């Protein structure tokens, strides 16, 4: 899994900290060993050994209350004799006294050689404030690993920038702050993180909007690419202000034609609006490019006070991934 310590960086001025929850998926009690790493691969502190009861037992580990962890960026690797699941929460350090900000992602149990992120940003304008991203890359192998990060601006067919990141130590994470990338223009991008040579990595991303909003999510490994995705719940301009963005990235290796990617939505029985939503991409999608839908701004497609499940499908069976963001 990936985890950050207390930190403030250019993409955000917040003092972020983490906690993670481990869940034992076995009927047997077990112990989890947690190794903490600094970005240079050295030990951040001595390993923790944490008991986790069987049958869904949990252990919650808070980095911001650990006196042995210095302020800064880092990563963690968790091992156990029994299968565990993990959830990482990023929050404001309670001692910082700042406006609350939070996000969460699933711990990564298996590395891959290629990861996809449908949406990242550098000083991009949005309806909810200026957007900036971190891309966090953890070495999940036993030797140093190098990667290339390709960033393709929305609407473009080729990467604007390919950034080589060399020699990430075992267990360590590299924090790529797009706000600090001088070679990148402002705007929204899709990203591809690919291992250069041998090894495997895990990837997550933080997307910051304005002063106080943050969304954390897992990148998609190449093994997850498919031609259809189901979304259990989409919100459209609810009375409590909830809205949804859907971003679909073309990973087929070639252009996807107009009308190939469909979005079909059925209202929940309790939805105030009972409209059925049916739409498709109105422009061709270049390789690694995206089509996006936004229930806040696309009022002609998405009625107000609507919620329900949706399905995304490629008529040509093109390989895609889909990112859903709630705001």
Question: Could you describe each region identified by the protein language model?
Answer:
Residues 1-327:
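Gly/Pro-rich, tryptophan- and cysteine-flecked surface segments typical
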């Amino acid at each position: 899994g990936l985890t950050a310590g207390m930190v403030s960086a250019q993409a955000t001025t917040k003092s972020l900290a983490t906690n993670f929850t481990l869940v034992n998926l076995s009927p047997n009690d077990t112990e989890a060993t947690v190794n903490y790493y600094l970005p240079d691969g050295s030990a951040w502190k001595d390993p923790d050994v944490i008991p986790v009861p069987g049958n869904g037992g949990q252990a919650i580990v808070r980095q911001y209350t650990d006196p042995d962890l210095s302020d800064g960026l880092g990563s963690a690797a968790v091992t156990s004799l029994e299968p565990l699941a993990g959830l990482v929460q990023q929050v404001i350090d309670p001692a910082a006294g700042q406006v609350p900000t939070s996000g969460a992602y699933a711990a990564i149990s298996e590395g891959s050689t290629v990861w996809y992120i449908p949406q990242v940003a550098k000083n991009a304008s949005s309806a909810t404030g200026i957007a900036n991203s971190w891309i966090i890359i953890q070495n999940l192998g036993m030797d140093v690993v190098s990667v290339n990060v390709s960033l393709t601006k929305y609407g473009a067919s080729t990467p604007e920038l390919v950034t080589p990141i060399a020699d990430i130590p075992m267990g360590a994470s590299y924090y790529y702050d797009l706000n600090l990338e001088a070679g990148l223009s402002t705007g929204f991008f899709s990203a591809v993180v690919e291992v250069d040579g041998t090894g495997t990595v895990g990837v997550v991303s933080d997307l910051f909007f304005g002063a106080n909003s943050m969304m954390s999510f897992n990148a998609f490994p190449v093994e997850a690419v498919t031609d259809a995705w189901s979304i259990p719940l989409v919100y459209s301009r609810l009375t409590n202000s909830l809205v949804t963005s859907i971003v679909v990235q073309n990973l087929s290796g070639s252009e996807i034609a107009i009308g190939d990617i469909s979005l079909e939505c059925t209202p929940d029985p309790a939805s105030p609006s009972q409209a059925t939503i049916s739409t498709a991409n109105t422009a061709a999608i270049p390789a690694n490019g995206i089509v996006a839908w936004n229930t806040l701004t696309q009022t002609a497609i998405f009625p107000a006070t609507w919620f329900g499940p949706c399905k995304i499908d490629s008529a040509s069976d093109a390989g895609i991934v889909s990112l859903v963001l709630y705001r």
